[in-house]
Amino acid sequence: MTARPDSDQDMPLVAHLTELRSRLLRSVAAVLLIFAALFYFAQDIYALVSAPLRAYLPEGATMIATGVASPFLAPFKLTLMISLFLAMPVVLHQVWGFIAPGLYQHEKRIAMPLMASSVLLFYAGMAFAYFVVFPIMFGFFASVTPEGVAMMTDIGQYLDFVLTLFFAFGVAFEVPVATFLLIWVGIVDVASLRNSRPYVIVGCFVVGMVLTPPDVFSQTLLAVPMWLLFEIGVFFGARIRHREEPAASDGPSQP
């Protein structure tokens, strides 16, 4: 069996805690630096994020602020969350630097691409929500507004709504990584996942039903990408399994 690095085995607990503290501080510093750079543009960032809704507001209608501090707090909160999202590569790099010494070499070869793909897929999920889901969703909401009701959304409630969807779609797009990990660590095998494909498809549509307006088109916009991402995870999980099986069979046999 491949031994873990001696440097990791010999490090005392205090050294581990000191390194953890240092990496946490670097992660926080990265978030704060990005926030400081973006804070001047906080109003513009909020205008950009609210554009999908404002495009469907009736002529002359605007968003409203029901709280005294909402005009300041909503852009502030949004900019802070955007800073956290943008700092994810730095945060994951610090996480990688902390856990890498304790990994086997073959684990390192897989872990780094998984972390990078996790970030990219999370960003892809957010972009999909903004460019595809939001226009359809807000267009639907505007079309079903009862007659005599003015559609004037509070900026704080809108922010909470879109942040929830950003996070939901970002996590939903992590399906390939989750599927790959389940196969790689041996919790499930490829055959079981392929046999459960009908249940996965139904589950994707259930998630789509929960996260999108109650129309088939919007549900399909989320369900189909989730299913395709699941298939991608199964495909790469099967490939890594096929690579590892010959390596295991070629290993030294016990006398």
UniProtKB/Swiss-Prot annotation:
Its Gene Ontology biological processes? intracellular protein transmembrane transport; protein transport by the Tat complex
Q: Which GO terms describe its molecular function?
A: proton motive force dependent protein transmembrane transporter activity
Q: Which PROSITE patterns match?
A: TATC (PS01218)
UniProt topology in membrane: Multi-pass membrane protein
Keywords from the UniProt entry:
Cell membrane, Membrane, Protein transport, Translocation, Transmembrane, Transmembrane helix, Transport
Kindly report the protein's main subcellular placement as a broad class. Answer: membrane
Bilayer-spanning residue ranges:
28-48, 56-76, 80-100, 121-141, 165-185, 195-212, 216-236
According to the UniProt record, one GO cellular component term is: TAT protein transport complex
Q: Where in the cell is it found?
A: Cell membrane
- The source's domain of life comes to Bacteria
* Short name of one Pfam family: TatC
Protein family per UniProt: Belongs to the TatC family.
The UniProt subunit note reads as follows:
The Tat system comprises two distinct complexes: a TatABC complex, containing multiple copies of TatA, TatB and TatC subunits, and a separate TatA complex, containing only TatA subunits. Substrates initially bind to the TatABC complex, which probably triggers association of the separate TatA complex to form the active translocon.
Record-linked PANTHER family: SEC-INDEPENDENT PROTEIN TRANSLOCASE PROTEIN TATC (PTHR30371), SEC-INDEPENDENT PROTEIN TRANSLOCASE PROTEIN TATC, CHLOROPLASTIC-RELATED (PTHR30371:SF0)
Q: Which HAMAP family match?
A: TatC
What functional role does this protein have?
Answer: Part of the twin-arginine translocation (Tat) system that transports large folded proteins containing a characteristic twin-arginine motif in their signal peptide across membranes. Together with TatB, TatC is part of a receptor directly interacting with Tat signal peptides.
- What is this protein's record name? Sec-independent protein translocase protein TatC
Its source organism is: Azotobacter chroococcum mcd 1
